[in-house]
UniProtKB/Swiss-Prot annotation:
Origin organism lineage: Bacteria, Pseudomonadati, Pseudomonadota, Gammaproteobacteria, Alteromonadales
Cofactor: Mg(2+)
SUPFAM superfamilies in alphabetical order: Enolase C-terminal domain-like (SSF51604), Enolase N-terminal domain-like (SSF54826)
UniProt keyword annotation of Secreted present: yes
EC code: 4.2.1.11
Superkingdom of this protein's organism: Bacteria
The protein's role, per its UniProt record: Catalyzes the reversible conversion of 2-phosphoglycerate (2-PG) into phosphoenolpyruvate (PEP). It is essential for the degradation of carbohydrates via glycolysis.
Active site (catalytic residues): 209, 341
Pathway where it operates: Carbohydrate degradation; glycolysis; pyruvate from D-glyceraldehyde 3-phosphate: step 4/5
Protein name, per record: Enolase
């Protein structure tokens, strides 16, 4: 038995200079695991609660000492002597101990950090890589694939200080034969884009996720810049590389309308979906995330109806990695893909349940980072372990993003042909 003998919580810093929670789980025999909880900027209103102290005299109220105390107190007491390999039981213990719908007593950040640290400790106990252990927990032992990266090379919205409304403009190297090659393609395009921006006298400062954040006149201008960068890097847009957007539309949804201040335009729900569709007709956009507000289910139905057969429509704020909400979406034919973020739901077990539900319904899965990240690279292992098919973990800049890509390189090296890179076929509507 992988007996837990200690659980430790601490306050560390994330990539935006805000505190977050780190946990360690120690087992008999000297095995241990350590993990950190990420934090989002544009968050869905139904996400599990990230517990912050609210003491304005300390870290502007963003301290996490209460969550840390919950780890070092009640969570530690509940898990002492338990088997770290029994992940579902550990997670349920913490969920029951919290006793609330959205983990607002102990904090999803506290529960998640311990949940992931326990998984890492259990993997160490079993003498296997984390991805292999998670695959066993997922009921898919030995089944792996390398994810297609969604590389956020140009930022707007809440992730940048500019006048671009759409939050993320991404490239997906779908024509690559391996993950290593896909990463190289993305890196070359990133550097090409930097040169294109410099030549136009535009800023090459970067946003939270490492993408450039220039002031552009419109969202279409951002796509045009990326098109030039892809071609200058020597690749064919639509063939070697497809584009993806994260609109984060909840951020500019006001009074039932979509107010694109950067564009100087206001759209109805259907009007904004039509606007996005027009962009997909002009550029090879294969995936659109949060193309409407999380509460605009009627609008989502229309968007799915007009684009769902050809374009991957990803629910992030819409589904918040929550099986109850995802089931409603599946039953009502809303979207066709889900973004998976550990900290939206707050435990590894619940995350795996959401991935399984999505796959069983024929929805694609995109494993995602948050804008506030750490050096923790667990999402890389999760993507491979569940054969998710896609990963979204920022640009080719900032070590908090690159850490995940580097872990994927290591995993691909270890697994070789056992973890194929399937490219375009992983994206809904592109097979």
């Amino acid at each position: 038995m992988a007996k837990i003998i200690n659980v430790i919580g601490r306050e560390i810093m994330d990539s935006r200079g805000n505190p977050t929670v780190e946990a360690e789980v120690h087992l008999e025999g000297g095995f241990n695991g350590m993990a950190a909880a990420p934090s989002g900027a544009s968050t869905g209103s139904r996400e599990a609660l990230e517990l912050r102290d609210g003491d304005k005299a300390r870290y502007l109220g963003k301290g996490v000492l209460t969550a840390v105390a919950n780890i070092n107190g009640p969570i530690r007491d509940a898990l002492m002597g338990k088997d770290a390999t029994a992940q579902a039981e550990l997670d349920q213990l913490m969920i029951d101990l919290d006793g609330t719908e959205n983990k607002d007593k102990l904090g999803a950040n506290a529960i998640l950090a311990v949940s992931l640290a326990a998984a890492k400790a259990a993997a160490a106990f079993k003498g296997m890589p984390l991805y292999a252990h998670i695959a066993e927990l997922n009921g898919t032992p030995g089944q792996f694939s390398m994810p297609v990266p969604m590389m956020n090379i140009l930022n707007g919205g809440e992730h940048a200080d500019n006048n671009v409304d759409i939050q993320e403009f991404m490239v997906q190297p779908v024509g690559a034969k391996t993950f290593r090659e896909a990463l190289r393609v993305g890196a070359e395009i990133f550097h090409s884009l930097k040169k294109v921006l410099q030549e136009k006298g535009l800023s090459t400062s970067v946003g939270d996720e490492g993408g450039f954040a220039p002031n552009l006149a419109s969202n279409a201008d951002a796509l045009a810049m990326i098109k030039v960068a892809v071609e200058k890097a020597g690749y064919k847009l639509g063939e070697d590389v497809t584009l993806a957007l994260d609109c984060a539309a909840s951020e500019f949804y006001k009074d039932g309308q979509y107010d694109l201040t950067g564009e100087g335009k206001v759209f109805s729900a259907n009007g904004f979906s039509d606007f996005l569709k027009s962009l997909t007709e002009e550029y090879p956009i294969a995936s659109i995330e949060d193309g409407l507000d999380e509460s605009d289910w009627e609008g989502w139905a229309y968007q799915t109806q007009i684009m769902g057969d050809k374009i991957q429509l990803v629910g992030d704020d819409l589904f918040v990695t929550n099986t109850k909400i995802l089931k409603r979406g599946i039953d009502n034919n809303i979207a066709n893909s889900i973004l998976i973020k550990f900290n939206q739901i707050g435990s590894l077990t619940e995350t795996l349940a959401a991935i399984r539900m999505a796959k069983e319904a024929g929805y694609t899965v995109v494993i995602s980072h948050r804008s506030g990240e750490t050096e923790d690279a667990t999402i890389a292992d999760l993507a491979v372990a569940t054969s998710a098919g896609q990963i979204k973990t920022g640009s080719l800049c900032r070590s908090d993003r690159v850490a995940k890509y580097n872990q994927l390189l290591r995993i691909e090296e270890q697994l070789g042909e056992k973890a194929p890179y399937r490219g375009r076929s992983e994206i809904k509507g592109q097979a």
